[in-house]
Amino acid sequence: MTTIRKNHPLFKAANSALIDLPAPASLSSLWNFGSLLGLCLISQIATGLFLAMHYAPETSSAFASVAHICRDVNYGWLIRNMHANGASFFFVCIYIHIGRGLYYGSYLYKETWNIGVVLLLLVMMTAFVGYVLPWGQMSFWGATVITNLLSAVPYIGESLVQWLWGGFAVDNATLTRFFAFHFLLPFVILALTLIHLIFLHETGSNNPLGLPSNSDKIPFHPYYTIKDIFGFLVLLFTLISLALFAPNLLGDPDNFTPANSMVTPAHIKPEWYFLFAYAILRSIPNKLGGVIALLCSILVLLVVPILHTSKHRSLTFRPVTQFLFWLLIADVLVLTWIGGMPVEAPYIITGQIASALYFSLFLILMPMASWVENKMLTW
């Protein structure tokens, strides 16, 4: 069996990635979230495939087809709830995964980090087009508002929006192409995930100390496979519990109303996992400025490796930057809260302060703190 595992052209690739892979001995549970993201992706593709078998991507029947799935298809309600709430769990895992990368300096593996940022953008795009498919009020108006941001692009903006819509408004052509994108993109994400892993296995994993661990490695199986399986069980138990006991907890009540272009909801907002970026978009009073800020809220992650000035890799031994890191986490939570609030005082000014702090932490405060800590090492 060992000979087949190590010599067979197919099995030896899996063996070197999942069984005999040398891994640092000190990885904490924060390193579980990469494999949990893989589980979320497989779960979303599986449930999405079954939903696509019964879904009708047509404006007159899309809303009814989702109701049909929940009422008439065997376990359709469970598949739909698993898929809708699975997206939320996907983003929880992504944000913790990125937070771990920022805290422990994993971004210094630049190729892996950059592919990860591209993956984040693709997952966000997939989730956005997926949210439009049930064709409820928030689906329709969310699609209208967010796609309309392209009109801020100078000179070609209006043409871009009409090209994306397939007409002069969000309508049947838009829904059909969004369904096509939502079906296709997860497979692109799957391919990029493999590239992400290939780059990771070129360098090996980072560890909580941020120190080279070449002298202290253990085989991935059985130590980390058991740890990952435990993580899988916790995630699946939590996801199934949410899907069974509170399936609509994270959704928007407006999406239970079929899309109506003549009635605008009182407060248009995206799903909770986009609210921090939505708050940054709204905090700029200029349309083009808001779109640029929205893009930069994600693309700022690409600048993090360039601005790393510390002599230490991880934040484990850097108390000043640690404080700023937790300030960033608090700031993102505040932005998430603001994104769900109406555009009125005191939320406007709070959102603007939180947005300014978000970019300041990444671009100014954290690099400055690293410089101060480097000086402190020489005292």
UniProtKB/Swiss-Prot annotation:
Residues given in the record as heme b b562 binding sites: H83, H182
State the protein's name.
Cytochrome b
**Any additional notes?**
Heme 1 (or BL or b562) is low-potential and absorbs at about 562 nm, and heme 2 (or BH or b566) is high-potential and absorbs at about 566 nm.
Concerning CDD domains, the annotation shows: cytochrome_b_C, Cytochrome_b_N
Q: Return one GO MF term.
A: ubiquinol-cytochrome-c reductase activity
Where located?
Mitochondrion inner membrane
**Protein purpose:** Component of the ubiquinol-cytochrome c reductase complex (complex III or cytochrome b-c1 complex) that is part of the mitochondrial respiratory chain. The b-c1 complex mediates electron transfer from ubiquinol to cytochrome c. Contributes to the generation of a proton gradient across the mitochondrial membrane that is then used for ATP synthesis.
Q: Which gene encodes it?
A: mt-cyb
The annotated subunit structure for this chain is: The cytochrome bc1 complex contains 3 respiratory subunits (MT-CYB, CYC1 and UQCRFS1), 2 core proteins (UQCRC1 and UQCRC2) and probably 6 low-molecular weight proteins.
Q: Which GO terms describe its cellular component?
A: mitochondrial inner membrane; respiratory chain complex III
Asked if the keyword Protease belongs to this entry, the reply reads no
- Which sites bind heme b b566? H97, H196
Q: Which residues cross the membrane?
A: 33-53, 77-98, 113-133, 178-198, 226-246, 288-308, 320-340, 347-367
Provide the family line. Belongs to the cytochrome b family.
Cofactors needed by this protein, per the record, are:
heme b
Record-listed a ubiquinone binding positions: H201
Q: Which GO terms describe its biological process?
A: mitochondrial electron transport, ubiquinol to cytochrome c
Keywords per UniProt: Electron transport, Heme, Iron, Membrane, Metal-binding, Mitochondrion, Mitochondrion inner membrane, Respiratory chain, Transmembrane, Transmembrane helix, Transport, Ubiquinone
Membrane topology term: Multi-pass membrane protein
Report which superkingdom the organism of origin falls in. Answer: Eukaryota
One matching Pfam family is Cytochrome_B
Please give the InterPro entries that the UniProt record associates with this protein. Cyt_b/b6_C, Cyt_b/b6_C_sf, Cyt_b/b6_N, Cytb/b6-like_sf, Cytochrome_b, Cytochrome_b_C_euk/bac, Cytochrome_b_N_euk/bac, Di-haem_cyt_TM
Task: Tell me the cofactor note.
Answer: Binds 2 heme b groups non-covalently.
Keyword Mitochondrion on entry: yes
